[in-house]
Amino acid sequence: LMKDLGLRPKRTVRVVLWTNEENGLRGGNAYRDAHKASLDNHILAIESDAGVFKPSGFGFSGTDEALAILQDIGTLLTPIESGIITKGGGGADIGPIMREGVPGMGLRVEGSKYFWYHHTNADTWDKLDRDEFNRCVASLAVMAYVVADMDDRLPR
């Protein structure tokens, strides 16, 4: 979305697709190990692992100062009803780098239908609600872009 809109934030936004969460977190651990020397340059880790249902906001684990900044950013997401930023969040896959001090947050969604599809033969693209999917993408893109484009780093 950022690329399509021609947006270039001040900092790099890295998208990582994880593997093996349910069977040992090998993807998250391997990422941490491969990037251990540069984790101080990781400003924020954002995980989306609850499906792409209607988003409501994010849960954040980090300092209160950073939480206040993210809550201000969250107001940009009010029009699509995904701007509530609460304390406590992250995700299993980003857990290894969070334990090394990287602040983390997870996208919160209305997940009542999650287990209708999760790891079943019904978990196919045709089940996606395009509007909910687009709201998730927009929520993640806005949060990632604004944090990456701030003049100052998100405080730890």
Residue positions per predicted region:
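Active-site-adjacent substrate-binding region
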Residues: 53-156
